[in-house]
Structure formats: C-alpha cells, structure tokens
Swiss-Prot record:
The active site is at 14, 140. The keyword Oxidoreductase does not apply. The lineage of its organism: Bacteria, Pseudomonadati, Thermodesulfobacteriota, Desulfovibrionia, Desulfovibrionales. It is an enzyme of class 2 (transferase). GO terms for biological process: isopentenyl diphosphate biosynthetic process, methylerythritol 4-phosphate pathway; terpenoid biosynthetic process. The keyword tRNA-binding does not apply. Its EC number is 2.7.1.148. The gene is ispE. This is 4-diphosphocytidyl-2-C-methyl-D-erythritol kinase.
Length: 327
C-alpha cells in the first residue's frame, strides 16, 4: 500500500483580472471568460500525515472537517478515476478567507491532487488527464494545477496560458471579511439579467479575449489593439488599457484588456461597503481597481510603492485584512 510522507503544503489563491459572464448553459451552469492570476498570499497550510485508511480533514474550524471538504472530494475523485491515493490525514489551517472570490478551497484541492499523482514516484496521470479529474472536483481547480496566469473560458475549466507581464507593479489585495455566496451572486445576476435590469454585456467580448491575451506582450502604448465591444450595435473602438492611464509605458499593463467584472453590479448593490473599498483604492492612487470573482475581495494596481503602502495602512487602521504584492 502506498504511503504519503509527512509534510506541510502551502496553497495560495487567485484573483480575476477580468471576468465576464457570457451566457447560461441548459444545465444551469454559467459560461464565462476570465483571466486568472495566481497570488502567493494569503495562503492555507495543510499538514499531511499518513493514515490507515481513507482521508480525514481536521481543523480548528468545525465547518472544515468531514467528508464535505473539497480536499476529501479531490481524494475520492482521484480514486474513482483509477488512481490509488494513499490514506492520509490533512490538518488544515485556513489563511485564505471564505466567500472572498480567491479560490482558496480550489487551491487546496489542486495541491492534494498533485500530491496524490506523484505519491508513487512517477506521475499516475498525465497533465491532461489530471486536469480532467480536477475539473470534476471544481471549476477553478484545473487553474491551480498550472498556477500561472491563464485565460479561462467555458465554466472556467478551459485554460490557455496568458503571456501577462505585470512586473514592477504593486498589487494591494483587500479582504474585508464579508462572505459573498457564489451561488447567490449567480442567481442575483440571473434575476437582474432576465428582468432586463442588468444587461450581461461586458467590456471584453469573449470572442476577442484569446486574441487580446495573445497580444499582451507585443502591444505598445502607440499600437492599441482594436476589437469589437460586447454590445450589439456599438461601433468598433480602440480598446482601453487595463488601467485608465495614457502615459507612455515600456511595459503596458494590458493595452488589449478591459478591467471588468460582471459580478460588481449585483454584488455592490447588496454590499455597498465593497464599492466604497474599491473607491478607496482608486482615491489612494490605484491605476485600476476591481472586485475578484464573485467577491468580496478587491484589488488595486499601483505604479507607486508609497501609494500602495498608504492604501495598505488605510485598511490596516480599520482592521481590514490587506496584502501587498510586488508583481
């Protein structure tokens, strides 16, 4: 019988640099186009120990224990696919907040799948096969197997690496402690869309997203990418950059992309404090700010380190969790 060595695994999180809901499938799942970007902090810690049978998740939080944890789902899905996962106990210490749109649980699942796949030495499944298993565990799980910037389509499981270079920028991630239910956010979007109160049109049409990502490295400030907008009847326009800035930039943030999130309209209408946090990031000098996923976390992109640190201090003084990343 295979055994897993005792070890501690650290799993991070992600943000969505843009997210547009493009439709609803007959089975109720939502199609989208999004750009995942991995972050190393906040993070969860998983202490892995060998066990006699099955998989057990322990935590100081009772709601994380038991078979409903996504870690258990990953273990059982791996076994059902023909793998031979070693018995293990996982002691989980959460650092990634729940209901924040950061994918902490998905990152846990991906880390466990990678561990299981190499438990016997040589990988049991190919990268492609493991990604298919990951998609059965959760829509965001395949991304964390890559853990590099990726364009995602479908329900988030169809991934293409994105040549995105944000080096030199400072990212301020704000985690307000508000939990936003992803099913609630989708249902709210459906209600507003079907009532005509919220048009599903985003600023980055799905059909142009792959081409936009392909040009991230080659598009300069004097050569903006042109693309149709997502709403019928609009004329062809020159795409704005990821930020609202116009100055010359040897490393444009993303002249081909729109910074957009379909969930902001519906989530901000119910959680007005999140809109205020976004405005605070912009007021402190962020070149751009956005909510990640279905919320509640938000991030701002800063050129200036001092401005990023000032924004961090603002939230720290109000006992709001905040993280600064130099990209």
């Amino acid at each position: 019988m295979l055994t897993v060595p005792q070890q501690t695994i650290r799993s991070g999180c992600k943000i969505n640099l843009f997210l547009e809901i493009t439709g609803v499938r007959p089975d109720g799942y939502h199609e989208l186009v999004t750009l995942f970007y991995p972050l190393s902090e906040p993070f969860d810690l998983m202490e892995i120990s060998p066990a006699t049978h099955g998989v057990t998740v322990l935590s100081e939080r009772a709601d994380l224990c038991g078979d409903k944890n996504i870690i258990c789902k990953a273990w059982h899905t791996f076994a059902a696919a023909g793998g031979t996962p070693p018995p293990m106990q996982v002691r989980l210490a959460k650092g990634v907040p729940d209901g924040a749109g950061l994918g902490g649980g998905s990152a846990n699942a991906a880390a466990v799948l990678k561990l299981l796949n190499t438990a016997g030495g040589a990988p049991r499944f190919s990268d492609t096969a493991l990604a298919k298993i990951a998609a059965q565990v959760g829509a965001d799980v395949p991304f964390f197997l890559h853990n590099t910037p990726c364009l995602a389509t479908g329900i988030g499981e169809k991934l293409v690496p994105a040549p995105l270079d944000l080096s030199g920028w400072h990212l301020v991630l704000v985690c307000p402690g508000v939990q936003v239910s992803t099913p609630w956010a989708y249902n709210r979007w459906d209600t507003l869309y079907r009532s005509g109160l919220h048009h599903p049109c985003g600023q980055l049409p799905a059909a142009h997203a792959p081409a936009a990502c392909a040009q991230l490295q080659t598009t300069g400030p004097d050569r903006p990418v042109r693309a149709e907008t997502g709403c019928a009847g609009r004329k062809k326009n020159t795409c704005r950059s990821l930020t609202t800035e116009r100055q010359a930039d040897s490393k444009p943030v993303s002249r081909a992309l729109w910074l957009f999130n379909s969930f902001e309209t519906v989530v901000f209408s119910a959680y007005s404090e999140l809109r205020q946090h976004k405005n605070t990031l912009l007021a402190h000098g962020a070149s751009a700010a956005l909510m990640s996923g279905s919320g509640s976390s938000l991030f701002g992109l800063f050129r200036d380190k001092a401005q990023a640190e000032a924004a961090m201090l603002h939230f720290c003084q109000r006992s709001i969790a905040v993280y600064v990343h130099r990209l």
